[in-house]
Design a protein with these regions (language model features):
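Serine-hydrolase catalytic machinery in alpha/beta-hydrolase-like enzymes
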Residues: 2-87
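Active-site signature of alpha/beta-hydrolase-fold catalytic machinery across serine-
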Residues: 29, 105-109
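Flexible "cap/lid" loop of the alpha/beta hydrolase fold
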Residues: 52-60, 122-139
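Gly/Ala-rich beta-loop-alpha elbow adjacent to hydrolase catalytic centers
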Residues: 94-99, 103
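A conserved short beta-strand
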Residues: 112-124
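C-terminal catalytic histidine-bearing segment of alpha/beta-hydrolase fold enzymes
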Residues: 139, 155, 168-200
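Short beta-strand/loop motif that positions the catalytic acidic residue
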Residues: 139-146
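Conserved alpha/beta-hydrolase "acid-adjacent" motif
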Residues: 147-154
Length: 200
C-alpha cells in the first residue's frame, strides 16, 4: 500500500484512512488536532484515482462488493503484518467515511489491530459480524444531517456491536452534515486525550 509516514517523538501511532476522493495527505491535519508527538502512518486507498480514490469498490445497490472488499481487507492485513509496530505502546486507527467503513471491515477480521478506533461518519453496511474484543475502545461519530448515512441504521449497528462484541464502543452525534465540524473535532480530541492519559 502507498502511504505517508511521519516519525514522532512518542511511542504512539496514528493510522489514517481517508474518505472517498482523499489521499494519504488528506487527514494529516488531524495529527495537529490530536497528537503532535505521535508518529503517523497515513494510507492511500487502493481503488480508483483522484476524486474516485477509496479503500474498496463502490457499493452495488447499496451493498458491498464482497469479493473486492475481502480482497482489499486481506491486502491490508498482509501489509500490516509486515510493519514493525513493536515500538508503539498505543495505536489508534482513524478513518473518515469510506476509510471508517474500511476499518469496520478490518474489525470483522482482526479486532485487536489497534488499541483505539475513531470512526468518523461511517455507514451501516452489510459487514460480517466482528469478533469480540472487550479491550478495544471505539468512537463512532455521526452527522445527523449527513445525506450519505442512515442515522437509525448506524445507531442500531453500534448498539449491536456494543452488546455483542465491543462493550467499550460509543456513538457521538453532531447536528451537522457529512464533514468534521469544530465541535466534533474538539470532542474527538478530548476523547483521544483521555485514552492517552490512561496509558501515561
Amino acid at each position: 500500500m502507498d502511504y505517508y509516514f511521519i516519525k514522532g517523538t512518542s511511542p504512539r501511532l496514528l493510522v489514517f484512512f481517508h474518505g472517498t476522493g482523499g489521499n494519504k495527505k488528506s487527514m494529516l491535519f488531524l495529527r495537529q488536532q490530536l497528537d503532535l508527538e505521535a508518529s503517523v502512518l497515513s494510507l492511500d486507498g487502493s481503488w480508483g484515482q483522484g476524486r474516485d480514490r477509496r479503500f474498496f469498490a463502490p457499493l452495488i445497490d447499496g451493498q458491498l462488493d464482497l469479493v473486492d472488499f475481502e480482497k482489499r481487507l486481506s491486502a491490508f492485513l498482509d501489509f500490516w503484518q509486515d510493519l514493525d509496530i513493536q515500538p508503539y505502546q498505543q495505536i489508534t486507527f482513524v478513518g473518515f467515511s469510506n476509510g471508517a467503513n474500511f476499518i469496520m471491515g478490518l474489525l470483522t477480521k482482526q479486532p485487536n489491530l489497534a488499541d483505539n478506533y475513531i470512526l468518523l461518519h461511517p455507514s451501516a453496511l452489510d459487514y460480517a459480524f466482528p469478533l469480540e474484543n472487550s479491550r478495544a475502545e471505539i468512537l463512532f461519530t455521526l452527522g445527523q444531517n449527513a445525506p450519505y448515512v442512515d442515522p437509525v441504521a448506524l445507531e442500531n449497528l453500534v448498539g449491536d456491536w456494543q452488546a455483542l462484541a465491543f462493550p467499550r464502543a460509543n456513538l457521538a452525534r453532531f447536528d451537522k452534515g457529512h464533514f468534521l465540524s469544530q465541535d466534533e473535532l474538539t470532542y474527538v480530541r478530548n476523547w483521544y486525550q483521555e485514552r492517552t492519559d490512561k496509558k501515561a
